[in-house]
């Protein structure tokens, strides 16, 4: 998971820089959480039956470093909760209906959104 998160951060910063768009720490964390879920999920053969287990492993009982500031802790908690909500909606709307290709299309659009738009999209999809 750490490798996926690191690659996610690197690529997302590069994509945003190429578009001359700034990116917040919360936006980085949220995208990395979504990327971890999707990466783990797509490695499995049966996406529909695997999604709940992957969600549980990634989001149900996260462990945060003890030395985080209150702001850092809040950022990680917010990213975790939003990504969990989004992952649940992806499962419900796409994976449960064997619509992986449609999900990937949505994820490409989601990737391009700025933080506020991502959070609004998650709230609407919930």
Give, region by region, the residue ranges found by the protein language model.
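Active-site recognition of the HExxH zinc-binding catalytic motif
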Residues: 1-14
């Amino acid at each position: 998971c750490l490798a996926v998160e690191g690659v996610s951060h690197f690529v997302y910063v590069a994509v945003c820089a190429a578009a001359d768009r700034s990116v917040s720490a919360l936006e980085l964390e949220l995208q990395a959480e979504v990327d971890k879920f999707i990466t783990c999920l797509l490695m499995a053969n049966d996406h529909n039956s695997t999604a709940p287990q992957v969600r549980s492993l990634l989001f149900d009982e996260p462990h945060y470093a003890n030395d985080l500031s209150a702001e850092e802790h809040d950022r990680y908690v917010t990213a975790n909760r939003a990504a969990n909500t989004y992952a649940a909606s992806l499962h419900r709307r796409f994976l449960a209906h064997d619509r992986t290709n449609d999900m990937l299309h949505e994820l490409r659009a989601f990737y391009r959104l700025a933080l506020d738009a991502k959070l609004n999209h998650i709230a609407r999809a919930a």
